[in-house]
């Protein structure tokens, strides 16, 4: 690596550490990804336990499906990290520093990814033994598949910010789209038993295929959907990052 490359890397790491630290200093984001998510799993699992032959099956369903919901909502964590008003002023200083604009959005993308991934993994470590939830015979595959999905979600949030230049607009659009896709994908309740038309409609939602991938891993110990989802999420992450390079404009911060 050249001297300039090493200097750019040190600058990036410095900015990344600051962004990563700021996320953990935000009690709302930490609480949403841990306490709120955990309570939602407990409440829905308890209330819907009677719908399953074994009450533990309800906890299995909602632990997996709501972790997926949390991963997708990582896009809003990233948008907050990127364009929250107080942070935006600091971003402006970085843009005109030798670090440049790329460090602004890519550091926040990677910081948001790690923040969400760590908290969601920690939540699984706590809830799985407590609720007798299985992540499959080899939980490493489950955790490994989470990584590109988490990164793609963070990249989506940053990409929307680069396109719409407004945190409020970005958060509203992301919240609406993610919630709609999750409802269609069966996050909160399965739509497969509501007729053939509704069952076909669910296949439109990418969340349906995320659910298939994670449930076949955790319940069937099958890697059938692992690589298709892993590769798709990785490619999507790269495309969204390139989209940020294309749409990011310094003047949007002035």
Regions found by a protein language model. Give the residues of each.
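Aromatic- and glycine-rich beta-strand/loop motifs that create alpha-glucan
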Residues: 2-36, 88-89, 253
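Membrane-interacting alpha-helical segments
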Residues: 10-13, 17-24, 28, 95, ...
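Membrane-interfacial helix-loop-helix junctions in multi-pass membrane proteins
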Residues: 22, 134, 186-240
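Hydrophobic alpha-helical transmembrane segments of multi-pass membrane transport/permease proteins
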Residues: 22-50, 59-77, 116-118, 174-183, ...
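Alpha-helical transmembrane segments of multi-pass membrane transporters/translocases
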Residues: 33-37, 43-45, 119, 144, ...
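Transmembrane helix segments
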Residues: 43-51, 163-204
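Hydrophobic alpha-helical transmembrane segments of multi-pass membrane transport proteins
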Residues: 59-127
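Alpha-helical transmembrane segments and their short interhelical loops
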Residues: 101, 107-182, 229-230, 241-242
